[in-house]
């Protein structure tokens, strides 16, 4: 995966200052035509941003620049290898800073292919026994459900008639577990309804019962600033998982 960062140039405008057509000009491939069944070529309207978002032209330019000095990460002492390794490590720090944990030695950024692989890594590393219990919810993407089913016992928090998480039920299950639930894995925002969970409130509840919180932020990162430290220690997010290709990163 690639995280591209750049400083604003003098000629750049802030996104809030752009008109509708200027927004379109930021992205690559927006005007690429595709064929219909009858052979006619049209410019499609994309509604699949929840799966993959279009890329910025500036990201494309940065990617092309990176290819000029592309080498093996941490595999040599040549200039290209060292340059690529530095870019790789810089990206890690950029991610940590973005979530306000850049100066906290308790956090690190781990690269994987996508959210599903991240969840599988966590499920296989954190869980030591099939009898361990993880608490998740009925609003999860399969990426935050199936990995736990394969590695441990899973319990679910229900949602109400409006699709909102039953916070009281979550706390009740944690309390009744008497410390047996070590991890609570929840979505930051539902990929079906768009409902945004109060992750810091949930984190506080989890820590009250000595459980750690894992947040699937695949559908949240692009739409809301996330401070993993919270406003106080009990609100900290222990693990945050997301995929750059689902979001608009520049």
Predicted regions and their residues:
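Pyridoxal 5′-phosphate
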Residues: 1-250
